Amino acid sequence: MAGSNVLQIEPLTPAIGAVLRGVNLAEPASDGLIDDIRQALLRHQVIFFEDQDLTPTQQRDFAARFGDLHVHPLYDTDNRHPEIMVIDNHVDNPTDNNFWHTDVTFIETPPMGAVLHAKQLPPVGGDTMWASMTAAYRALSTPMQRFLEGLEAVHDFAYAFTPQGLAGSQAGAERYAKAVAENPPVIHPVIRTHPETGEPGIFVNSVFTSRIKGLRREESRALMDFLNRHVQQPEFVVRWRWTPGAVAFWDNRCTQHRAVDDFLPHRRVMHRATILGERPVFSPG
């Protein structure tokens, strides 16, 4: 293992993922430790911390060291901390995130990252997988890279979220209508340059990207189908088996992820803090 005097870093795959040991996220972290964690995140794209006993306040405070926090317009949040999204899946509320996606790309400045804490786990199953979009880009042919670098895509809240499940109550219907009105479709580059590493990566996903701008519908669908299959290759992926208290921190600018929906009828409760980022751009060369 390699790392700083505090952190021990164990890579999980050549492309993506590492376990960080030697840090208690419940304790206030020095600026130096935060920088070490940031550098590990940039290098490994998703990092994991085991056996972390975090309150929602502590999780929020740790995530806020990396930027302003996002409050999701639809999902339930902690009663005292709207920045902490509560993902509580069980028989009466099955998971809806079991598709490959990058979080919240339907806003002008999608998140730079997210911190996910395991609060209650099923006895088996319920893993999460992450895929490296920079590794996926590098695996494309040079002509395909150049073609994609000239394209933009539409990301749309209403494409991903429907009124189903909310329409049963007036409050739910109003909440959905408000979210749609406040989140019109946005345009992002198909290939995004990472603002800190300078690496290019694929920045479309099956959940929020409705179409490729400028292409005919059948052309857009064919290209999206190809890219959505391409990014799932196992060489780009790390699969994390959750343990009680574990924390995942991923770079949302260069990854996709998905939950594995195999744990019902058991319950799985996760808390997520989402860190806002910057407007995606592509910088040639």
Sequence positions of predicted segments:
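Non-heme Fe(II) oxygenase catalytic core, chiefly the N-lobe of the double-stranded beta-helix
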Residues: 2-247, 252-285
